[in-house]
Amino acid sequence: MDLLKQRKMGILPEIDIAGHAYTVDLRLNELRNVELPNKKLSLDEMVTAPNGRHYLFFYDIESRSILHASSDMVTLPTNAVLVEIPDELGLDPVGMARKYGLSDEYFLKMHPYEKAGKATLTSLDKSGLPEFVVANQKLLQQDLQDPQKITFRKSP
């Protein structure tokens, strides 16, 4: 049975992220780990790439979770990569059509249904995260030199 027929019968597509298989579930707006279904990656937590056709996020390979870069990140994570995956139409055009009440074939001319894809991985040293961490370290050093800033930042 071909992939499109399987999808129309309700079999959800999968994508490989750093060697981990994820089920694409657009109805719930998430990628669900095939081996550990409680490990979910929410599409809402991902950033749209500049081209508007992909999502970007940092992925912790060990914990199988999205890694959030924040102002308190002062060390570079060791088991993480920058991940790029297609947007919803690239992941599951049939699922997108169903989400909006359209026929299953609605998006297939521009977005053919394909075999499960593989995420594009970029090492952290080429992701911009090291520079972000260095900037956070500098801010932390400035805060340590000015105790008022520490108190100000920590107050509710």
Per-range role (PLM):
Residues 1-17, 31, 37-67, 85:
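Short, flexible domain-boundary/linker segments around small modular repeats
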Residues 72-73:
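OB-fold/S1-family single-stranded nucleic acid-binding modules
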Residues 88, 116-132, 140-149:
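Eukaryotic compositionally biased low-complexity/IDR segments
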Residues 24, 133, 148-156:
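Non-Sec secretion/translocation targeting segments of pathogen effectors
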Residues 16-34, 56-63, 69, 79, ...:
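Extracellular/lumenal glycan-associated surfaces
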Residues 95, 103-128:
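A positional "C-terminalness" feature that preferentially activates on distal terminal regions of long
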